[in-house]
Structure formats: structure tokens, C-alpha cells
Amino acid sequence: MDQKLLTDFRSELLDSRFGAKAISTIAESKRFPLHEMRDDVAFQIINDELYLDGNARQNLATFCQTWDDENVHKLMDLSINKNWIDKEEYPQSAAIDLRCVNMVADLWHAPAPKNGQAVGTNTIGSSEACMLGGMAMKWRWRKRMEAAGKPTDKPNLVCGPVQICWHKFARYWDVELREIPMRPGQLFMDPKRMIEACDENTIGVVPTFGVTYTGNYEFPQPLHDALDKFQADTGIDIDMHIDAASGGFLAPFVAPDIVWDFRLPRVKSISASGHKFGLAPLGCGWVIWRDEEALPQELVFNVDYLGGQIGTFAINFSRPAGQVIAQYYEFLRLGREGYTKVQNASYQVAAYLADEIAKQGPYEFICTGRPDEGIPAVCFKLKDGEDPGYTLYDLSERLRLRGWQVPAFTLGGEATDIVVMRIMCRRGFEMDFAELLLEDYKASLKYLSDHPKLQGIAQQNSFKHT
């Protein structure tokens, strides 16, 4: 054997990964790599790059889960090669999916299904779930208008401050979005402004049960009652879809007396994130319809796929079944009792943070993390006319130096001059961890006080309100 080949072969077998030839070059980023490399070297390169990501457990901007127990990891590993869409090939995974749909429908007080199976589907998140709910609204509205012999070319959707997915829905499906703007002192959709935006071309009204900007609930019942009066006055019947991305897996456990779900007759569909307060890993959402009549059959496809026939009304197709299976694990593992305990713990942390932060500066709280107010989030602004010598951007930047990702951002609509800070509390952010945040919060304030020349230089950062 050629001596050079022998040397190269020996090196590939025996060299430490940090002595390997492949690791001495910059990893390819613009062209498809020409040559292979050892698996341990490729892993090391990628693993090292990922250290530059933020620590997910310290990410207090995200609504998504950042803690999962070992059994979830095991179930995800077992399901990594199971395609969720292949119902015939993976019938038990499909059965688990249907069980979850029934459980979520029961949680949200959907009427008992005629055939024993609730109407709904798993999605990759609440955004896809919103798209499906919006499509069904448009189709139902169009059918009503066609039956009345009226034009269907100018549909509109009425909402308050919503996630970006509703802007996408409006653009992709050619619907006018009538978003009730945030105003100082009026940050959410109210019955009066909602009714002013409605007409016979309104396909539906979408309250956000857990507004992403602040964490507060947009309570559906007052809006629902206003739509009842609107119909009595005008004859126009308008449906509701509840975007419960966060609140859908909170209120049923910690604030069951809030009437927000299918107990309201106008609510035809509800969407939520399983991977937020549903406690599932990333990539899980749910949309449930009141009954079969609420989901137009034109949106349901029966297709041949890999030897089987399936009915599907999701936008996405192939994806792992692990997220659904992990969601089912959480439902079984915790039940109503366990979910109530976990969610209450997050609210207790939020209340503690709100109380302690209130002592640190001239703050006005928009959300204090009470179960009857919204999700377990703390959102506040500097009081009008107060100048503590720093901005919330400065504070956010200082906290980030300690690894904490606490967003400061402006509100939307007509309230863009209002800067808020928002802290999300969720499973895994326990009381002791919150105390560490407070210590760094106080240290950051002291630093800003001791270095006044640095105050006010931080710019609006890249955090998004979602």
C-alpha cells in the first residue's frame, strides 16, 4: 500500500477529533461540501457552533417550553422515523393523535361529537392552527353569502393586536385585516371598536386569549355579547375564532370560571400551541372545531398516500409523529390535577416577580401574572413623566450580559411610543431561578446608576414581542 495512503488512513482512524484534518479548516457554509469527514468531527463542529446560541432556560422572551423530562426525549427518539401523515403505516400513532383531539375538545367544552370523535387536528404550532381556523371561517362566510346571492370578493377579519400569523393569513388568503389598534389606555380589542369594524363581509372576529405583546387576555365573552346585539340590530351573524395560543392550556386549569371557549355559541373554532403551555416539545399545535358543520367539507381531503387513504385538513404534510406522542404523554402523566399544579406554580413565580420588581423602580404594570388577568407574564413600563436615568433597553442589555433574555420593545398600533419589558414565566422557571434573576436585575440597576454615561445608549434590540 502506498505510504501516503497508509498514513492518511492511520490518521483517520487514530487522530483526535481536534487533530483531524477536517477540523483545521472553516466549515463550509455557501457550497455543498465536496468530501466526507468523520462523524465525530462533524458533530464537534456543529456542537461548538451551538454554544453561541442563548441558554434556552434563561430565555424569558419565549412562550415556548424549554424544559422536557427524560421520557419525552425517549418517546421523541422512538418516533423520529414515524411520519405523522402515514395513518395506515402507523395506526397506533394515528390513534394517539385522535385521542389527543378528543381530550383537547373536552378541555374546551366542545359539544359531544355525534360519532364519538371530536373535530380537530394536530398542527406544527398555533400559527398553522390559526391558518386552518381562518380558512374555515372564510369558507363558511362565502357559502352564506353565495346562498344569499351576495358578492364574496371583499372578505374582512376583525381582531385586536394579533400574532404575525394572522397578517400572513390575511395576505395569503386575500382577506382584509381590520386590526383594532392599540392605544394608550386602550391596549386591547373592546366591544365598541369591534362592532364599528364589523359588517356583512366580516368572516369572523378573533380575540387573542393571551395577547403576545403584554400577556393579558382579550376576554371573548363581552365581544360575544356585543355580536349578539349586533345581530339583533342588523341581522348580520358573525362567527368567532379564539386564538388561545397560550391561554388555551392555562384558563381551563387555573381560571375555569372564565367563559371563553365553546361555552360561547358563536365560537366555531379554537387554536392553541401544544408547545407553549400545553407543555409539549416544539412543533405541536391544535385546532378544534365546534362540530362537523363548523368545518367545511371542501377543506377535507381524502388522498392516496403510500398505499393507504387518509382524510387530512392540515396545511403541512410529512413530519415526525413524536410531538403528538409526547403531548399524549404529558396529558396522561399530568392530567387535570398535574396541569393545575404546574400552571399554578408559574403564576406564583410571576406574582412574586411582579411584587419584587415593583419595589425597584417607577414602574406601571400592564400585566402582573394573575390567573384572572392573563397568562403568567409580567409586563411593565416606566411611569409617565418618570426618568430613572436608564431605559428599559439599557436594562435588557445589562441582563443579557448575564445570559438572561428579557425583551424590551415598543407596543404596536397607536402606542408605539410606549416601551415595555415582558418576562415570561413557565415550567422550569422555578422560584429559586426567579430569585437569581432578581439578583441580576438589582445588580444591573446598580451598574446603570454607577455609570450614568452609559445610560440611554442601548438601542431597541432584536427581541420580538412574540
Swiss-Prot record:
SUPFAM superfamilies, sorted: PLP-dependent transferases
EC class: lyase
GO BP term, pick one: glutamate catabolic process
Enzyme Commission no = 4.1.1.15
Q: Which InterPro entries match?
A: Glutamate_decarboxylase, PyrdxlP-dep_de-COase, PyrdxlP-dep_Trfase, PyrdxlP-dep_Trfase_major, Pyridoxal-P_BS
Q: Does Lyase show up as a keyword for this record?
A: yes
Which Gene Ontology terms cover its molecular function? Answer: glutamate decarboxylase activity; pyridoxal phosphate binding
What does the UniProt keyword field contain? Decarboxylase, Lyase, Pyridoxal phosphate
Q: Name one GO cellular component term.
A: cytosol
- CDD domains, from UniProt? DOPA_deC_like
List the catalytic activities from the record: L-glutamate + H(+) = 4-aminobutanoate + CO2
Residues modified to N6-(pyridoxal phosphate)lysine: K276
Q: Does the keyword Lyase apply?
A: yes
What is the induction comment? Answer: By acidic conditions. Expression is regulated by a complex system involving RpoS, cAMP, CRP, EvgAS, H-NS, GadE, GadW and GadX. The level of involvement for each regulator varies depending upon the growth phase and the medium.
* Gene3D superfamilies (alphabetical): 3.90.1150.160, 4.10.280.50, Type I PLP-dependent aspartate aminotransferase-like (Major domain)
**What role is this protein assigned?**
Converts glutamate to gamma-aminobutyrate (GABA), consuming one intracellular proton in the reaction. The gad system helps to maintain a near-neutral intracellular pH when cells are exposed to extremely acidic conditions. The ability to survive transit through the acidic conditions of the stomach is essential for successful colonization of the mammalian host by commensal and pathogenic bacteria.
Q: How does it assemble?
A: Homohexamer.
Name it: Glutamate decarboxylase alpha
Source species: Shigella flexneri
Taxonomic lineage per UniProt? Answer: Bacteria, Pseudomonadati, Pseudomonadota, Gammaproteobacteria, Enterobacterales
Q: Which gene encodes it?
A: gadA
